[in-house]
Amino acid sequence: PYEKIGAELVKEVAKKTDDVAGDGTTTATVLAQALVREGLRNVAAGANPLGLKRGIEKAVEKVTETLLKSAKEVETKDQIAATAAISAGDQSIGDLIAEAMDKVGNEGVITVEESNTFGL
């Protein structure tokens, strides 16, 4: 039963991460798995589950605060290209994404579809 609960939790973490950020699902899954594993280990060793939950919540608040302080706005076409290139692992894809975003604007929608034609 615990394995199924853990699997559902990790699945939900990955889905939520993908919905909110669109990236980072592997990192979120690894972190969730570590939290579950260490949480169960600590509870088995006698830790108070509610105290453990409160500690995790405080840690999440602190990490979120630290990340928000170090976050930088991505505003220029070059910054968008660089960010997209890192995410895609390919500079040419980063440039294409930046060009598409430049054309549609911040509120625009970009649709990506599979094609059998090379280069399109």
UniProtKB/Swiss-Prot annotation:
Subcellular compartments: Cytoplasm
Enzyme class: isomerase
GO biological process annotation, one example: protein refolding
Protein residues bound to ATP: D23, G24, T25, T26, T27
GO cellular component, one term: cytoplasm
EC number(s) stated in the UniProt entry for this protein: 5.6.1.7
SUPFAM superfamilies recorded: GroEL equatorial domain-like (SSF48592)
Pfam families: Cpn60_TCP1
Keyword Membrane attached: no
The entry's keywords: ATP-binding, Chaperone, Cytoplasm, Isomerase, Nucleotide-binding, Stress response
Effect of K62S: In strain: 1373
UniProt xrefs under PANTHER family: 60 KDA HEAT SHOCK PROTEIN, MITOCHONDRIAL
Family per similarity comment: Belongs to the chaperonin (HSP60) family.
Protein purpose: Together with its co-chaperonin GroES, plays an essential role in assisting protein folding. The GroEL-GroES system forms a nano-cage that allows encapsulation of the non-native substrate proteins and provides a physical environment optimized to promote and accelerate protein folding.
Quaternary data: Forms a cylinder of 14 subunits composed of two heptameric rings stacked back-to-back. Interacts with the co-chaperonin GroES.
Name listed for the protein in its UniProt record: Chaperonin GroEL
Species assigned in the record: Mycobacterium intracellulare
